[in-house]
Regions:
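Internal alpha/beta scaffold segment
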Residues: 228-261
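Conserved alpha/beta enzyme-core scaffold
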Residues: 25, 87, 91, 99, ...
Length: 280
């Protein structure tokens, strides 16, 4: 069966050099993952514990989701439920509309991507700015992410340099990754400062405490939520874990499995709220 993804993949693979480079890059990440996992003697035990927790959570969603909602509300959050993409997009829009929001910054959210939140909000006159560097690159290129963790892994630095020259006025022909990263940081800082609302996804939602946990390497989620008075956290019900003990198992596995790191640079828990906040 032909799908949008398979058609896009077939088109991408026509460029043999790019396909080979992409394959090599992904295998480098996989090699890091394999190497780092072997540094943990109890790696397989942790995986089995995580699997058992997921099986438990998925078979007790009715209880865990209600527990999460009650605890999140007790923490001061507002909780909304959406049955499908249309309802989800409209809930977010209604929250933004109620607050008169026209500028909106977000970190990575698979739910928002799957539900096509960005084009929906843009059609309503709301500016959406992606703060994850890979997602921002793709947003400026009007492309979709190609990987759940490394969204712009198929884009070469020369392409990024040419893009930033057009969009941010960087030096022509300067493709140094550090230089380009600093240019993106400077450009995004103004977006952070003037954003009226920040959205994050969630790597985990803890039922027993009502907290959400967001893991990033760039700190963009933290930067986003530190400025605006309104924060929206959007995630699917599969993110639920029963308690902090379970959370500890997953945080030990997450970065090693995803990017071959011992831990993500930033692991932030949002529990008790100090500003007027909506949580979705």
């Amino acid at each position: 069966m032909s799908t949008k993804h398979s058609k896009a993949a077939a088109e991408f693979l026509k460029n043999k050099k790019q396909a080979a480079w992409h394959d090599e890059t992904l295998w480098l990440v996989r090699a890091k993952r394999d190497r780092l996992s072997k540094e943990v003697p109890e790696w397989e035990e942790l995986r089995n514990m995580a699997c058992a927790t997921k099986l438990y959570s998925n078979s007790h969603l009715d209880e865990l989701l209600v527990e999460f909602e009650n605890n999140a509300r007790a923490n001061g959050a507002h909780v909304y439920w959406a049955k499908d993409a249309d309802e989800y997009c409209n809930i977010v829009y209604n929250i933004l509309n109620q607050h008169g929001v026209k500028h909106f910054i977000k970190s990575k959210s698979m739910l928002a991507e799957e539900c096509e939140l960005n084009p929906f909000l843009e059609s309503k006159g709301i500016e959406v700015v992606e703060s994850d560097l890979g997602e921002r690159i793709l947003q400026l290129m009007h492309l979709k992410p190609s990987h759940i963790v490394l969204p712009a892994i198929h884009i070469k630095r020369e392409q990024v340099g040419e893009l930033f020259e057009r969009e941010m006025g960087t030096e022509k022909g300067n493709f140094d990754p550090t230089y380009l990263t600093h240019a993106a940081r400077k450009n995004l800082r103004q977006k952070f400062i003037h954003a009226e609302v920040a959205m994050t996804g969630a790597n985990f939602a803890v039922a027993s405490t009502g907290e959400i946990v967001v893991c990033t390497n760039e700190g963009n989620a933290d930067m986003g939520t530190s400025q605006p008075k309104l924060q929206i956290a959007a995630f699917g019900m599969e993110k639920i874990v029963p308690d902090r003990e379970s959370l500890g198992v997953f945080t030990r596995l997450l970065a090693r499995s995803a990017t071959g790191q011992p831990i993500t640079t930033y692991t932030v828990s949002y529990t008790h709220l100090t500003l007027p906040t909506n949580s979705l």
